[in-house]
């Protein structure tokens, strides 16, 4: 094989389809837009969700729910992430932020019981799941709600 015999891989190069450039191209005259009407015009077309004047789906269905203005969002930490600390460490939200376990404390920290805890720790957080409290105390540690 020589340099002048190199060819691009099959299907790697697609020729751009130039519409409205002669009837022989197969996309001349109306350029694939059909005859007249809203969709044939420049900038034409209907907005998303428009159903031709029929009452659209988003208006046929009833409204549901509301946005709770006092919603609290907690940063979640699983037990397995706490194994990085030494035995006897007091794990506080400040320590979790410092060590990068959580990047944003949001409205507080909630400890969940996913994974296995092998260290004896004193954990301070805003919320605990029941399984997390059980696992921390089983490992000989303490939980403290702040």
Swiss-Prot record:
Q: Where is the composition biased (Gly residues)?
A: 21-31, 42-52
Gene Ontology MF annotations: rRNA binding; structural constituent of ribosome
Basic and acidic residues bias located where? 1-13
Classify the source by domain of life: Bacteria
- UniProtKB keywords: Ribonucleoprotein, Ribosomal protein, RNA-binding, rRNA-binding
Kindly indicate whether the keyword Chloroplast belongs to this entry. no
According to the UniProt record, one GO cellular component term is: cytosolic large ribosomal subunit
**InterPro entries on file:** Ribosomal_uL15, Ribosomal_uL15/eL18, Ribosomal_uL15/eL18_sf, Ribosomal_uL15_bac-type, Ribosomal_uL15_CS
**Region listing for Disordered, in residue ranges:** 1-65
* Pfam families hit by this protein: Ribosomal_L27A
PANTHER family in the record: 50S RIBOSOMAL PROTEIN L15, LARGE RIBOSOMAL SUBUNIT PROTEIN UL15M
Q: How does it assemble?
A: Part of the 50S ribosomal subunit.
* Similarity section: Belongs to the universal ribosomal protein uL15 family.
- The identity of this protein, by name, is Large ribosomal subunit protein uL15
Q: Which gene encodes it?
A: rplO
